[in-house]
């Protein structure tokens, strides 16, 4: 799924951890699904 990372959008790979992959290189915090 897709979630908003503060002012950006990325693919949320880990919904439990709340982290997503950006540009396939860096990891940023994403909105976690409750």
UniProtKB/Swiss-Prot annotation:
One of its GO terms (cellular component) is extracellular region. Its main location: secreted. It is found in: Secreted. The keyword Kinase does not apply. SUPFAM superfamilies: Defensin-like. This is Corticostatin-6. The keyword Metal-binding does not apply. Belongs to the alpha-defensin family. Pfam families: Defensin_1. Microbicidal activity and inhibits corticotropin (ACTH) stimulated corticosterone production. Keywords: Antibiotic, Antimicrobial, Defensin, Disulfide bond, Secreted. PROSITE patterns: DEFENSIN. Disulfide bonds join 3-31, 5-20, 10-30. Lung, spleen, small intestine, pituitary gland, adrenal medulla and plasma. InterPro entries: Alpha-defensin_C, Beta/alpha-defensin_C. It comes from the Eukaryota. GO terms for biological process: defense response to bacterium.
């Amino acid at each position: 799924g897709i979630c908003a990372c503060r002012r950006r959008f990325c693919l949320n790979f880990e919904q439990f951890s709340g982290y997503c992959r950006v540009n396939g290189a860096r990891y940023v915090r994403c909105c976690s699904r409750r």
